[in-house]
From Swiss-Prot:
Keyword DNA-binding applies: yes
Lineage: Bacteria, Pseudomonadati, Pseudomonadota, Alphaproteobacteria, Hyphomicrobiales
GO cellular component, one term: cytosol
Disulfide bonds: none
Protein location: Cytoplasm
The protein, known as: Probable transcriptional regulatory protein Mnod_7401
Family classification: Belongs to the TACO1 family.
Organism: Methylobacterium nodulans (strain LMG 21967 / CNCM I-2342 / ORS 2060)
Length: 248
C-alpha cells in the first residue's frame, strides 16, 4: 500500500488525473456498474457499491454520472465484465499487481502485456508476485478529521490492524473480512471516508534509485492508461528528490 499510495500522490501532483478525466470517470463508472450488478443498487446496502461511489465523489465525478452508472446495472443491456488479476515485474525487479475489469479477456491480456514490454517490464503468471503482498481492507480519511493519536485509538477500537498518518491523511488497514465493520465504525465517528476498498499491501517496500524509479513510474502510467485496468499495486518507493522533481 505504501508504494501504491506514494505513486498515487505523484499522479495527482502531476495533474494527470485532470488530463485524463474522461478516462478516469469511465473506469469509476464501470466499477459502479459492476458493483451494483453484483449486489443491490442501493449503496447503503451494498458495501462495494458504496466504496465505488465514494471513490467517484473523491474524483469529483458528477452526481448524474454516478446515478447513470447505477441505473445501467439495473437494465438488461449492461455489459458483463470479468474481473482479472495480472502480476508482473518492472525494472529493477519491482513487483506489480494489476486489477482489471474486462468484457474481452484476450484484448485486455494483450494490452497489459504490451504495456509491460514497452516499459521494460515483464508479465508473469498469476501467483508470481502476489505472495509478496497481503490482501487487506483500507479506509482512508483526510488529515483534518482527527490527529494521529485520536485516529489510532479509534481504529484499534474498531478492530483495525494498523494506521499510517501524515500530512496527506490517515490510512487505516484491517483484515479484508473486517472492512465493512471497521469502515462503519470509523465513519460514525469521523464522517464519510475518502476511500474504502480492498488493496494489495506489499509486505516489504523496495527503495529504488531515481533512474529505476522513473522507469517504474512510466511502466505504471502505461498500465493505468489501459481502459480495462482499474488498479495497480506496487512494492517500490521512490526518493523524495524524485517526488519533488515530478511535482514541479
Amino acid at each position: 500500500m505504501a508504494g501504491h499510495s506514494q505513486f498515487k500522490n505523484i499522479m495527482h501532483r502531476k495533474g494527470r488525473v485532470d488530463a485524463v478525466r474522461s478516462k478516469v470517470f469511465g473506469k469509476l463508472a464501470r466499477e459502479i456498474t459492476v458493483a451494483a450488478k453484483l449486489g443491490t443498487p442501493d449503496p447503503a446496502m451494498n458495501p462495494r457499491l458504496r466504496a465505488a461511489v465514494l471513490a467517484a465523489r473523491a474524483e469529483n465525478m458528477p452526481k448524474d454520472n454516478i446515478e447513470r452508472a447505477i441505473k445501467k446495472a439495473c437494465g438488461g443491456d449492461a455489459e458483463t465484465y470479468e474481473e482479472i488479476r495480472y502480476e508482473g515485474y518492472g525494472p529493477g525487479g519491482a513487483a506489480l499487481i494489476v486489477e482489471a475489469q474486462t468484457d474481452n479477456r484476450n484484448r485486455t491480456a494483450s494490452d497489459v502485456r504490451s504495456a509491460f514490454t514497452k516499459a521494460g517490464g515483464s508479465l508473469a503468471e498469476t501467483g508470481a508476485v502476489s505472495f509478496m503482498f497481503d490482501r487487506v481492507g483500507l479506509v482512508a480519511f483526510d488529515a483534518k478529521v482527527a490527529d494521529a493519536d485520536t485516529m489510532l485509538e479509534a481504529a484499534i477500537e474498531a478492530g483495525a490492524d494498523d494506521v499510517k498518518s501524515d500530512e496527506s491523511g490517515h490510512e487505516v488497514t484491517c483484515e479484508q473480512s473486517a472492512l465493512g465493520e471497521v469502515a462503519k465504525a470509523l465513519e460514525a465517528r469521523f464522517g464519510e471516508p475518502r476511500r474504502t476498498s480492498l488493496v494489495w499491501r506489499p509486505q516489504n517496500t523496495v527503495e529504488v534509485d531515481d533512474e529505476t524509479g522513473e522507469k517504474l513510474i512510466r511502466l505504471v502510467e502505461m498500465i493505468e492508461d489501459q481502459d480495462d485496468v482499474q488498479n495497480v499495486f506496487v512494492n517500490f518507493a521512490v526518493s523524495d528528490a524524485l517526488m519533488a522533481k515530478l511535482h514541479d
